[in-house]
């Protein structure tokens, strides 16, 4: 089975503030989500994973790519066409 992934570019530079804002929006607007422990890479990059009934949501604060972005198996209309 192929799972569609929605990608949302939030910030063109890595940013703890933008990363925290995205996580806050997801946590406040999504119902019945489970937050996993945050993953931190050796370069300081962070990944926050959320589980929902419809699929996973992954929020990245990626210092190697230098961006904040979301890859999600769930369509997140709150991020379509806008950035934080």
Residue ranges of model-derived segments:
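Short, compact, well-ordered microdomains
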Residues: 53-84
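Alpha-helical structural elements
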Residues: 1-3, 14, 45, 58, ...
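Short beta-strand element of the conserved SAM-dependent methyltransferase core
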Residues: 8-11, 48-52, 70
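Short, intrinsically disordered low-complexity segments
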Residues: 40-60
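General N-terminal targeting signals
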Residues: 25-27, 36, 43, 50, ...
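Negatively charged, low-complexity tracts enriched in Asp/Glu with abundant Ser/Thr
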Residues: 1-39
